[in-house]
């Protein structure tokens, strides 16, 4: 600082050692914020143009609402989804039900008796 009590700000990375090291590491400087010197007329114009752009985007969505029905020729038949294996869904449901009943028997906590000797200090 000089005698006039003003700080000198510099954009030179060599003037400040930590900034110089950061510049060498590939970290860029922050982008300047857009200026706020826009007049009121320009602001209103940009709002209107944004609204028009939003309406144009909505028009694109309307094109997709008129979908054609699915052609049956595109539906895969012949069990290709199960790789040729036939599945008996009733048998699979019974098997799952039996497994669930076996798991319920293992979860009985009524028979559990804690060992109080292990809990003492």
From Swiss-Prot:
InterPro entries: Histone_chaperone_domain_CHZ. Coiled coil: none annotated. Residues 22-32, 85-99 have a biased composition (Basic and acidic residues). It is found in: Nucleus. Residues 1-10 have a biased composition (Polar residues). The keyword Phosphoprotein does not apply. Residues 11-21 have a biased composition (Low complexity). Keywords: Chaperone, Nucleus. GO terms for cellular component: nucleus. SMART domains: CHZ. Residues 39-65, 100-121 have a biased composition (Acidic residues). Residues 1-121 are annotated as: Disordered. Its main location: nucleus. Forms a heterotrimer with H2A.Z-H2B, stabilizing the association of the histone dimer. Also, with a lower affinity, forms a heterotrimer with H2A-H2B. Forms a chaperone-bound H2A.Z-H2B complex that acts as a source for SWR1 complex-dependent H2A to H2A.Z histone replacement in chromatin. Belongs to the CHZ1 family. This is Histone H2A.Z-specific chaperone chz1.
């Amino acid at each position: 600082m000089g005698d006039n009590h003003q700080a000198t700000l510099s954009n030179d990375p060599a003037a400040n050692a930590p900034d110089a090291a950061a510049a060498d590491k590939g970290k860029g400087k922050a982008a300047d914020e857009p200026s706020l010197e826009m007049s009121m007329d320009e602001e209103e114009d940009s709002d209107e143009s944004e609204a028009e752009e939003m309406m144009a985007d909505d028009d694109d969505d309307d094109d997709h609402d008129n979908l054609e029905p699915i052609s049956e020729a595109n539906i895969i038949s012949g069990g290709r989804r199960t790789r040729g294996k036939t599945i008996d869904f009733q048998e699979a449901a019974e098997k799952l039900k039996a497994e669930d009943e076996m798991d319920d028997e293992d979860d009985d906590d009524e028979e559990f008796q804690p060992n109080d000797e292990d809990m003492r200090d």
